[in-house]
């Protein structure tokens, strides 16, 4: 039995049993706990959940997108990754350039109105096609604001900061781990108090701290808000992957990924799905392969990252709260 996965299942059950009933921005409602933590020993295996299928291709393409410093969804769509579609789509339908059917509250309406769901899909397909094939449209509606990749790779400085106009936090982090591994300042942040609150979806995983001890590199990530059924399994795998990649490029073995979450919630319309997941058996965790020929964190491609021996229960679909 995997303690890595069991702690996720145990926490899911605790949220169901003890979580406070809260309203939320999306109008969906949640069961919520505040201040939770899971610790994943990466020597046990790669923590990609097995009680439901988690699509690793989406995780690695999103992380590569972050590491590119990108905040336009075209790269994701080119890799058939639609994780961020809804937030860019919302920007389009709320603009004066949109002339199609009324898309108000499209997230909730598409779940309860079969006819509207078809209309929504038609408009979404138009949007995706335009992002992929129309450069002007991509420039106007493909950006999702000052989030992750943009903040990681090109944090904008102010007039009081000497030197470059932007800070590449990731490049600096790699240098710091190599040169001052005992530093307590091995930090990567994605929360800018000035610009982040105005983003379509303000950063959820906001702070990461790396830690070197006994020849191993560990990582703790603080997440202000965790959608426990849909989002958190991706976050666990994504930051475990990031830890593996940074360790490979700095000469360390991997240690622990420590996941600390503020508002840890299960949406009311995910309760049936996570209850189904809790009834399923676990399988042995898979292994991660990284191409050892890659010499820079920024040179990895989709083909350089693979998951091996992944055996899981089937996927469980659930609506995204937007």
Swiss-Prot record:
GO BP terms, alphabetized: dTMP biosynthetic process; dTTP biosynthetic process; methylation
Keywords from the UniProt entry: Cytoplasm, Methyltransferase, Nucleotide biosynthesis, Transferase
Main location: cytoplasm
Enzyme class: transferase
CDD domains membership: TS_Pyrimidine_HMase (cd00351)
Catalytic activity: dUMP + (6R)-5,10-methylene-5,6,7,8-tetrahydrofolate = 7,8-dihydrofolate + dTMP
GO cellular component, one term: cytosol
MF (Gene Ontology): thymidylate synthase activity
Subunit structure comment from the entry: Homodimer.
Similarity annotation: Belongs to the thymidylate synthase family. Bacterial-type ThyA subfamily.
PANTHER family from the UniProt entry: THYMIDYLATE SYNTHASE, THYMIDYLATE SYNTHASE 1
Annotated NCBIfam families: PRK01827.1-2, thym_sym
Annotated protein name in UniProt: Thymidylate synthase
Organism in which the protein naturally occurs: Leuconostoc mesenteroides subsp. mesenteroides (strain ATCC 8293 / DSM 20343 / BCRC 11652 / CCM 1803 / JCM 6124 / NCDO 523 / NBRC 100496 / NCIMB 8023 / NCTC 12954 / NRRL B-1118 / 37Y)
């Amino acid at each position: 039995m995997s303690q890595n996965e069991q702690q996720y299942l145990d926490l899911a059950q605790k949220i169901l049993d003890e979580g406070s009933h809260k309203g939320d921005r999306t109008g969906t409602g949640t069961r919520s706990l505040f201040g939770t933590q899971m610790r994943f020993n990466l020597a046990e295996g790669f923590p990609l959940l097995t009680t439901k299928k988690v699509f690793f291709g989406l995780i690695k393409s999103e992380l590569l997108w972050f590491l590119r410093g990108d905040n336009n969804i075209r790269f994701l769509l080119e890799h058939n990754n639609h994780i961020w579609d809804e937030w860019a789509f919302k920007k389009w339908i709320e603009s004066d350039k949109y002339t199609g059917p009324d898309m108000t509250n499209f997230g909730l309406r598409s779940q309860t109105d079969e006819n509207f769901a078809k209309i929504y899909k038609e408009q979404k397909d138009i949007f995706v096609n335009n992002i992929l094939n129309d450069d002007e449209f991509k420039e106007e509606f493909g950006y999702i604001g000052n989030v992750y990749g943009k903040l990681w790779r090109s944090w904008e400085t102010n007039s009081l900061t000497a030197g470059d106009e932007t800070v590449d936090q990731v490049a600096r982090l790699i240098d710091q781990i190599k040169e001052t591994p005992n530093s307590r300042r091995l930090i990567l942040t994605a929360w800018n108090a000035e610009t982040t609150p105005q983003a379509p979806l303000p950063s959820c995983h906001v702070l990461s701290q790396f830690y070197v001890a006994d020849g191993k590199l560990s990582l703790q990530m603080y997440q202000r808000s965790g959608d426990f059924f849909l989002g958190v399994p991706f976050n666990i795998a994504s930051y475990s992957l990031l830890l593996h990649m940074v360790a490979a490029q700095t000469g360390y073995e991997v240690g622990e990924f420590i996941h600390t979450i503020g508002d840890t919630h299960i949406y009311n319309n995910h309760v049936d799905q996570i209850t189904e997941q809790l009834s399923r058996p676990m399988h042995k965790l898979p292994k991660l392969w990284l191409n050892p020929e890659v010499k820079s964190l920024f040179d990895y491609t989709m083909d350089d990252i693979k998951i091996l021996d992944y055996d899981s229960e089937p996927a469980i679909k659930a609506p995204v709260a937007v």
